[in-house]
């Protein structure tokens, strides 16, 4: 009985370590992509760390239930990284940007929108036995490409609520 309990504990512990390793690997892969293109012409990068997220949350005025949900979501976010490329036509980073979701572990496509050559994809990764989740949004338009990567302790439904609230949050 002790042996079985020990095996179960070891399995749970190893899953926790693997989940944390997947998150670290994903973060490193996306950070390397940001670093590669950070000083490139026509590319803007925005990185919002935990301290700035707290400042944003502290500056919000809560007036209703939606605002309370937004505040809870903001408190659960650890970081937001955004890359925007403004350039007409296809760019050299488009293919590489859309490969990120395949290179990163655990990302699941949760929604994809395609219309007249424009594409928007949403990916979500939740790591077993870890409170860290990742959200990746990739957008390709005729004159712009956008990558948004959010990490924190949230769920798919939290991200859905964020989308429903739209510009009312930030």
Features from the language model and the residues they span:
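Short helix C-cap/helix-to-loop transition motifs enriched in small/turn-promoting residues
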Residues: 90-91, 102-107, 131
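Bacterial Sec-dependent N-terminal signal peptides
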Residues: 1-24
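Early exported N-terminus immediately downstream of N-terminal targeting peptides
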Residues: 23-93, 97
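A short, solvent-exposed beta-edge/loop patch
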Residues: 123-156
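Terminal interaction module
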Residues: 83, 92, 124, 135, ...
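C-terminal partner/receptor-binding element of secreted or periplasmic proteins
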Residues: 30, 152-170
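Extracytoplasmic
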Residues: 40-43, 75-79, 104, 115-119, ...
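Short Gly/Thr-rich strand-loop-strand
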Residues: 98-126
């Amino acid at each position: 009985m002790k042996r079985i309990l020990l095996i179960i504990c070891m399995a749970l512990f190893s899953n926790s370590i693997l989940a944390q390793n997947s998150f670290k690997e994903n973060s490193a892969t996306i950070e390397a992509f940001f670093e590669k293109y950070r000083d490139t012409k026509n590319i803007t990068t925005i990185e919002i760390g935990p301290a700035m997220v707290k400042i944003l949350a502290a500056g919000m005025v809560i007036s209703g239930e939606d605002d309370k949900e937004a505040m809870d979501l903001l408190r659960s976010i650890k970081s937001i990284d955004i890359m925007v490329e403004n350039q007409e036509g296809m760019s050299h980073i488009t293919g590489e940007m859309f490969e990120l979701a395949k290179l990163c572990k655990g990302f699941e496509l949760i929604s994809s929108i395609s219309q007249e050559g424009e594409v928007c994809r949403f990916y979500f990764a939740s790591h077993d036995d870890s409170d860290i989740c990742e959200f990746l949004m990739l957008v390709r338009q005729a004159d712009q490409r956008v990558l948004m990567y959010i990490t924190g302790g949230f769920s798919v439904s939290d991200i859905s609520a964020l989308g429903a609230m739209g510009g009312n949050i930030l």
